[in-house]
Protein backbone atom coordinates (compact mmCIF):
# COMPACT_ATOMS: atom_id res chain seq x y z
CA UNK A 1 0.00 0.00 0.00
CA UNK A 2 1.15 3.53 -0.82
CA UNK A 3 2.03 5.89 2.03
CA UNK A 4 -0.10 8.59 0.41
CA UNK A 5 -3.78 9.37 0.81
CA UNK A 6 -5.97 11.61 -1.32
CA UNK A 7 -8.48 13.74 0.59
CA UNK A 8 -11.38 15.34 -1.27
CA UNK A 9 -14.35 17.57 -0.42
CA UNK A 10 -12.35 19.79 1.95
CA UNK A 11 -13.96 23.14 2.72
CA UNK A 12 -12.22 25.99 0.87
CA UNK A 13 -11.51 27.96 4.06
CA UNK A 14 -9.43 25.15 5.60
CA UNK A 15 -5.72 25.95 5.42
CA UNK A 16 -2.94 23.57 4.47
CA UNK A 17 -1.60 23.77 8.02
CA UNK A 18 -4.98 22.80 9.47
CA UNK A 19 -5.11 19.81 7.14
CA UNK A 20 -1.58 18.82 8.14
CA UNK A 21 -2.37 19.24 11.85
CA UNK A 22 -5.42 17.00 11.54
CA UNK A 23 -3.62 14.18 9.78
CA UNK A 24 -0.57 14.47 12.03
CA UNK A 25 -2.61 12.62 14.64
CA UNK A 26 -2.29 9.58 12.38
CA UNK A 27 1.49 9.85 12.18
CA UNK A 28 4.29 11.95 10.76
CA UNK A 29 3.34 13.81 7.57
CA UNK A 30 6.31 14.00 5.21
CA UNK A 31 4.65 16.03 2.46
CA UNK A 32 1.34 17.70 1.70
CA UNK A 33 -0.04 19.50 -1.34
CA UNK A 34 -3.46 21.05 -1.95
CA UNK A 35 -5.36 22.28 -4.98
CA UNK A 36 -8.73 23.85 -5.59
CA UNK A 37 -11.38 21.57 -7.04
CA UNK A 38 -14.48 23.60 -7.85
CA UNK A 39 -15.92 24.85 -4.57
CA UNK A 40 -13.80 22.48 -2.49
CA UNK A 41 -10.16 21.45 -2.06
CA UNK A 42 -8.28 18.24 -2.69
CA UNK A 43 -5.18 17.34 -0.68
CA UNK A 44 -2.48 14.75 -1.24
CA UNK A 45 -0.84 13.72 2.01
CA UNK A 46 2.33 11.66 2.18
CA UNK A 47 3.05 9.87 5.45
CA UNK A 48 6.35 8.54 6.66
CA UNK A 49 4.93 5.14 7.58
CA UNK A 50 2.23 2.86 6.11
CA UNK A 51 0.54 2.44 9.50
CA UNK A 52 -0.27 6.16 9.50
CA UNK A 53 -1.88 5.78 6.08
CA UNK A 54 -4.12 3.01 7.38
CA UNK A 55 -5.19 5.11 10.34
CA UNK A 56 -5.92 8.06 8.05
CA UNK A 57 -8.27 5.89 6.00
CA UNK A 58 -10.38 5.38 9.14
CA UNK A 59 -11.19 9.10 9.21
CA UNK A 60 -13.68 8.95 6.35
CA UNK A 61 -16.51 11.49 6.81
CA UNK A 62 -14.68 13.50 9.47
CA UNK A 63 -15.47 17.22 9.40
CA UNK A 64 -12.80 19.62 8.17
CA UNK A 65 -14.39 23.03 8.00
CA UNK A 66 -18.02 22.60 6.99
CA UNK A 67 -17.63 19.48 4.86
CA UNK A 68 -17.32 15.76 5.47
CA UNK A 69 -14.05 14.73 3.88
CA UNK A 70 -13.56 11.67 1.68
CA UNK A 71 -10.30 9.72 1.92
CA UNK A 72 -8.75 7.12 -0.37
CA UNK A 73 -5.27 5.69 -0.67
CA UNK A 74 -3.24 6.69 -3.71
CA UNK A 75 -3.51 3.17 -5.10
CA UNK A 76 -7.23 3.00 -4.34
CA UNK A 77 -6.78 0.29 -1.73
CA UNK A 78 -8.85 -0.07 1.42
CA UNK A 79 -7.43 0.12 4.90
CA UNK A 80 -5.63 -3.04 5.97
CA UNK A 81 -6.28 -4.47 9.41
CA UNK A 82 -3.23 -6.71 9.64
CA UNK A 83 -0.63 -4.46 11.27
CA UNK A 84 -0.25 -3.40 14.88
CA UNK A 85 1.53 -0.09 14.34
CA UNK A 86 5.04 -0.18 12.84
CA UNK A 87 7.99 -2.43 12.68
CA UNK A 88 11.35 -2.14 14.32
CA UNK A 89 10.98 -2.93 18.00
CA UNK A 90 14.20 -1.11 18.86
CA UNK A 91 12.90 2.24 17.61
CA UNK A 92 11.28 4.85 19.81
CA UNK A 93 7.51 4.80 20.05
CA UNK A 94 5.78 7.20 17.68
CA UNK A 95 2.31 8.58 17.12
CA UNK A 96 1.74 5.72 14.67
CA UNK A 97 2.38 3.19 17.45
CA UNK A 98 -0.56 4.29 19.55
CA UNK A 99 -3.75 2.20 19.56
CA UNK A 100 -6.13 3.57 16.98
CA UNK A 101 -8.75 4.17 19.67
CA UNK A 102 -6.23 6.37 21.47
CA UNK A 103 -5.63 8.38 18.30
CA UNK A 104 -9.37 8.79 17.74
CA UNK A 105 -9.79 9.88 21.36
CA UNK A 106 -7.08 12.50 20.92
CA UNK A 107 -8.83 13.88 17.85
CA UNK A 108 -12.13 14.07 19.71
CA UNK A 109 -10.49 15.77 22.67
CA UNK A 110 -9.14 18.50 20.39
CA UNK A 111 -12.61 19.32 19.10
CA UNK A 112 -12.71 17.39 15.84
CA UNK A 113 -15.98 15.79 14.74
CA UNK A 114 -15.73 12.15 13.66
CA UNK A 115 -18.28 9.60 12.51
CA UNK A 116 -19.53 6.69 14.60
CA UNK A 117 -18.19 4.34 11.93
CA UNK A 118 -14.69 5.65 12.64
CA UNK A 119 -15.16 4.92 16.33
CA UNK A 120 -16.49 1.44 15.64
CA UNK A 121 -13.63 0.48 13.34
CA UNK A 122 -10.94 1.81 15.66
CA UNK A 123 -12.31 -0.17 18.61
CA UNK A 124 -12.63 -3.32 16.53
CA UNK A 125 -9.06 -3.05 15.28
CA UNK A 126 -7.66 -2.52 18.76
CA UNK A 127 -9.75 -5.37 20.11
CA UNK A 128 -8.49 -7.67 17.36
CA UNK A 129 -4.80 -6.77 17.48
CA UNK A 130 -4.30 -5.33 20.94
CA UNK A 131 -2.07 -2.48 22.09
CA UNK A 132 1.34 -2.15 20.49
CA UNK A 133 4.17 -2.98 22.87
CA UNK A 134 5.93 0.11 21.59
CA UNK A 135 3.03 2.30 22.68
CA UNK A 136 3.61 1.22 26.25
CA UNK A 137 7.04 2.76 25.81
CA UNK A 138 5.36 6.13 25.45
CA UNK A 139 4.28 5.95 29.08
CA UNK A 140 7.84 5.21 30.11
CA UNK A 141 9.01 8.14 28.00
CA UNK A 142 6.55 10.42 29.75
CA UNK A 143 7.66 9.06 33.10
CA UNK A 144 11.32 9.79 32.40
CA UNK A 145 10.47 13.47 32.02
CA UNK A 146 9.07 13.73 35.55
CA UNK A 147 11.39 11.51 37.57
CA UNK A 148 13.28 14.56 38.79
CA UNK A 149 10.21 15.58 40.81
CA UNK A 150 9.39 12.08 41.96
CA UNK A 151 9.81 12.72 45.69
CA UNK A 152 7.35 15.58 45.63
CA UNK A 153 4.69 14.08 43.38
CA UNK A 154 5.29 10.33 43.84
CA UNK A 155 4.99 9.92 40.10
CA UNK A 156 7.11 6.79 39.89
CA UNK A 157 4.92 4.86 42.30
CA UNK A 158 1.86 5.79 40.28
CA UNK A 159 3.43 4.95 36.95
CA UNK A 160 4.71 1.59 38.13
CA UNK A 161 1.12 0.59 38.80
CA UNK A 162 0.10 1.09 35.17
CA UNK A 163 1.22 -2.21 33.66
CA UNK A 164 -0.30 -4.21 36.50
CA UNK A 165 -3.64 -2.42 36.60
CA UNK A 166 -4.75 -2.07 33.00
CA UNK A 167 -7.15 -5.01 33.34
CA UNK A 168 -8.17 -4.65 36.98
CA UNK A 169 -11.81 -3.91 37.75
CA UNK A 170 -11.16 -0.68 39.64
CA UNK A 171 -10.33 0.96 36.30
CA UNK A 172 -14.06 0.99 35.70
CA UNK A 173 -14.31 3.80 38.23
CA UNK A 174 -12.58 6.05 35.71
CA UNK A 175 -15.37 5.89 33.16
CA UNK A 176 -16.41 9.44 33.99
CA UNK A 177 -13.58 10.61 31.71
CA UNK A 178 -14.32 12.13 28.30
CA UNK A 179 -13.31 8.95 26.53
CA UNK A 180 -15.88 6.90 28.39
CA UNK A 181 -18.54 9.60 28.08
CA UNK A 182 -18.06 9.78 24.34
CA UNK A 183 -18.05 6.01 23.93
CA UNK A 184 -21.31 5.68 25.83
CA UNK A 185 -22.95 8.43 23.78
CA UNK A 186 -21.90 6.70 20.60
CA UNK A 187 -23.22 3.39 21.85
CA UNK A 188 -26.54 4.97 22.78
CA UNK A 189 -26.78 6.47 19.30
CA UNK A 190 -26.21 3.06 17.76
CA UNK A 191 -28.40 1.17 20.24
CA UNK A 192 -30.59 -1.48 18.72
CA UNK A 193 -28.45 -1.91 15.62
CA UNK A 194 -26.10 -4.77 14.81
CA UNK A 195 -23.24 -2.30 14.48
CA UNK A 196 -24.05 -0.84 17.87
CA UNK A 197 -23.98 -4.29 19.45
CA UNK A 198 -20.59 -5.03 17.92
CA UNK A 199 -19.18 -1.75 19.20
CA UNK A 200 -20.57 -2.39 22.67
CA UNK A 201 -19.08 -5.87 22.85
CA UNK A 202 -15.68 -4.65 21.70
CA UNK A 203 -15.82 -1.65 23.99
CA UNK A 204 -16.80 -3.61 27.09
CA UNK A 205 -13.95 -6.06 26.49
CA UNK A 206 -11.28 -3.45 25.91
CA UNK A 207 -12.21 -0.29 27.78
CA UNK A 208 -10.23 -1.02 30.97
CA UNK A 209 -6.93 -1.10 29.16
CA UNK A 210 -7.65 1.92 26.98
CA UNK A 211 -8.97 4.03 29.84
CA UNK A 212 -6.02 3.02 31.98
CA UNK A 213 -3.61 4.21 29.32
CA UNK A 214 -5.35 7.54 28.85
CA UNK A 215 -5.77 8.32 32.53
CA UNK A 216 -2.28 7.33 33.60
CA UNK A 217 -0.77 9.25 30.70
CA UNK A 218 -2.83 12.30 31.61
CA UNK A 219 -1.80 12.05 35.24
CA UNK A 220 1.87 11.89 34.29
CA UNK A 221 1.54 14.83 31.92
CA UNK A 222 -0.30 16.91 34.54
CA UNK A 223 2.33 16.19 37.17
CA UNK A 224 5.05 17.24 34.76
CA UNK A 225 3.25 20.48 33.92
CA UNK A 226 2.73 21.30 37.59
CA UNK A 227 6.36 20.66 38.40
CA UNK A 228 7.59 22.83 35.56
CA UNK A 229 4.98 25.53 36.15
CA UNK A 230 3.71 25.27 32.57
CA UNK A 231 0.16 24.06 33.08
CA UNK A 232 -2.33 26.01 30.97
CA UNK A 233 -5.99 25.72 29.93
CA UNK A 234 -6.73 23.55 26.92
CA UNK A 235 -6.92 25.48 23.66
CA UNK A 236 -10.26 25.64 21.88
CA UNK A 237 -8.47 25.35 18.53
CA UNK A 238 -7.60 21.84 17.34
CA UNK A 239 -3.84 21.38 17.20
CA UNK A 240 -1.43 18.67 16.17
CA UNK A 241 -0.22 16.18 18.79
CA UNK A 242 3.04 16.74 20.62
CA UNK A 243 5.66 14.19 19.65
CA UNK A 244 6.40 11.30 22.01
CA UNK A 245 4.12 12.59 24.78
CA UNK A 246 0.67 11.02 25.18
CA UNK A 247 -2.36 13.17 25.68
CA UNK A 248 -5.82 12.38 26.92
CA UNK A 249 -9.16 14.10 26.35
CA UNK A 250 -9.71 17.27 28.34
CA UNK A 251 -12.55 18.99 26.46
CA UNK A 252 -15.96 17.78 25.36
CA UNK A 253 -16.50 16.66 21.77
CA UNK A 254 -19.28 15.00 19.82
CA UNK A 255 -19.89 12.87 16.80
CA UNK A 256 -21.34 13.93 13.49
CA UNK A 257 -24.89 12.96 12.69
From Swiss-Prot:
A GO CC annotation recorded here is: cytosol
Query: Phosphothreonine-modified residues are where?
Result: 230
Source organism superkingdom: Eukaryota
Species of origin reads Schizosaccharomyces pombe (strain 972 / ATCC 24843) (Fission yeast)
Q: What stretch or stretches form a coiled coil here?
A: none
- GO molecular function terms noted in the UniProt entry: RNA binding
Identification of the protein by name: Protein vip1
Q: Per the record, which residues fall in region Disordered?
A: 74-99, 217-257
Boundaries of every RRM domain copy: 3-76
Which residues does this entry mark as bearing Phosphoserine? 132, 177, 232, 235
Q: Which UniProt keywords apply?
A: Phosphoprotein, RNA-binding
- Which InterPro entries does the record match to this protein? Nucleotide-bd_a/b_plait_sf, RBD_domain_sf, RRM_dom, Vip1_RRM
Q: Which regions are flagged for Low complexity bias?
A: 75-84, 230-257
Amino acid sequence: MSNQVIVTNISPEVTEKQISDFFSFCGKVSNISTEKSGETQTAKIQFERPSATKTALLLQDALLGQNKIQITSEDGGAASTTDQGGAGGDQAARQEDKPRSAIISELLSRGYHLSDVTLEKSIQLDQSYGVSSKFKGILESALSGVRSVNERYHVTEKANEVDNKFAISDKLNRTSSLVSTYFHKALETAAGTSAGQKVQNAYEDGKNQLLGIHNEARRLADAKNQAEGTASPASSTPTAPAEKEPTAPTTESKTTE
